[in-house]
């Protein structure tokens, strides 16, 4: 499960910000706050609550965040200097209360990261600091982070699956789409309750969560034979980008190919070389190739204008034509991430020694007994 890709693409809206106390890493939230209502595995009714995430506190912090995502999208292809610049940019944005930056830092610090063959070990105390910051701000998403911490023994928390599921269900009731998606998977795999699974997937899909749309598309196609709705869900998933959007683009490429391959249920749809090529371009943009990284942070809000579903006429002019004008300008003329990170350190917005992430020491050679 790649939580990082899913969470990083939630669209931020309204927010407040504030200073961060380093003492937040020293507390244990579950010992100082009452536990939420116990998880009910027999519950089958959910109201599809929605959540409006915090918006960027200012333009500068949002620029730092967006610059960090340019490096983040490189994955293992970024070098060690870029990896540190990314953390500097995220930490600077987070210091102003930028929700998306804090979200990505929590996940980086819990999972670790890699760059050019170099591994960076998890940083539990840093993850804990940002987890507690979100909880203190009453961010609904922070309940999902606490679920993750308790369920995966992250951020210095002890494994407590019962309490973890209680926080997951609380996050669902507060409208967090990733939590809705995660709980849908639990109803599917653990309880074999497919109806509740679909209800929760629909809740997340309504909020633009691409992984939920892609999964719901598969269900509509296979379980119900509803090809029209399945096709629309794939198209919608692509609009919102992310891992689900990349998977949807791959499937749509097959839908409009002469040889439908895995999407042979759509045999009645005529081959369309223009759409096939456009969806292939979008898939590479999101997922990358064997030699180039994709960018799961891309979104395509103008997709219906330039690449509507058939039989409508297309106006495709490449991936930037499907982006917002602001995004197209940003990605075609990206900022100098190294210069931004250096300026942050020069201005003392964050201190180098406080954000430096040392690489994991190399593994000792194996003793072959000779």
Located regions from the model:
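Short helix-capping/linker turns of helical repeat alpha-solenoids
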Residues: 57-64, 71-75, 95-100, 105, ...
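TPR/TPR-like (Sel1-like) alpha-helical repeat modules
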Residues: 203, 231-243, 253-261, 266-290
């Amino acid at each position: 499960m790649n939580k990082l890709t899913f969470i990083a693409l939630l669209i931020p809206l309204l927010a407040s910000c504030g200073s961060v106390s380093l003492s937040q890493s020293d507390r244990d939230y579950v010992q100082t706050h009452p536990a939420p209502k116990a998880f009910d595995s027999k519950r089958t009714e959910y109201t599809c609550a929605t959540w409006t995430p915090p918006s960027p506190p200012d333009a500068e912090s949002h620029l730092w965040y967006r610059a960090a995502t340019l490096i983040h999208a490189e994955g293992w292809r970024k070098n060690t200097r870029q990896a540190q610049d990314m953390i500097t940019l995220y930490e600077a944005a987070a210091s102003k209360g930028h929700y998306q930056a804090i979200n990505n830092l929590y996940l980086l610090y819990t999972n670790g990261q890699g760059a050019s063959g170099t591994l960076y070990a998890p940083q539990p105390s840093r993850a804990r600091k940002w987890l507690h910051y979100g909880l203190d701000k009453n961010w609904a998403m922070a309940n999902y982070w606490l679920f993750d911490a308790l369920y995966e023994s992250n951020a210095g928390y002890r494994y407590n699956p019962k309490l973890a599921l209680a926080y997951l269900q609380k996050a669902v009731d507060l409208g967090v789409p990733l939590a809705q998606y995660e709980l849908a998977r639990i109803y599917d795999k653990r309880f074999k309750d497919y109806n509740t699974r679909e209800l929760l997937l629909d809740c997340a899909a309504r909020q633009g969560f691409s992984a939920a749309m892609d999964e719901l598309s598969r269900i509509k196609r296979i379980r119900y034979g509803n090809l029209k709705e399945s096709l629309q869900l794939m198209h919608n998933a692509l609009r919102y980008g992310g891992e689900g959007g990349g998977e949807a683009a791959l499937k749509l490429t097959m839908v409009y190919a002469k040889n439908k391959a895995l999407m042979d249920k759509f045999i009645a749809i005529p081959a369309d070389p223009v759409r096939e090529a456009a969806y292939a371009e979008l898939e590479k943009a999101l997922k990358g190739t064997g030699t180039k990284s994709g960018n799961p942070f891309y979104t395509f809000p103008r997709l219906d204008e330039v690449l509507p579903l058939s039989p409508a006429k297309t106006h495709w002019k490449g991936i930037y034509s499907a982006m917002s004008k602001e995004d197209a300008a940003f990605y075609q003329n990206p900022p100098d991430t190294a210069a931004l990170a250096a300026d942050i350190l020069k201005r003392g917005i964050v201190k180098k020694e406080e954000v430096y992430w040392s690489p994991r020491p190399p593994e000792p050679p194996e003793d072959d007994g000779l």
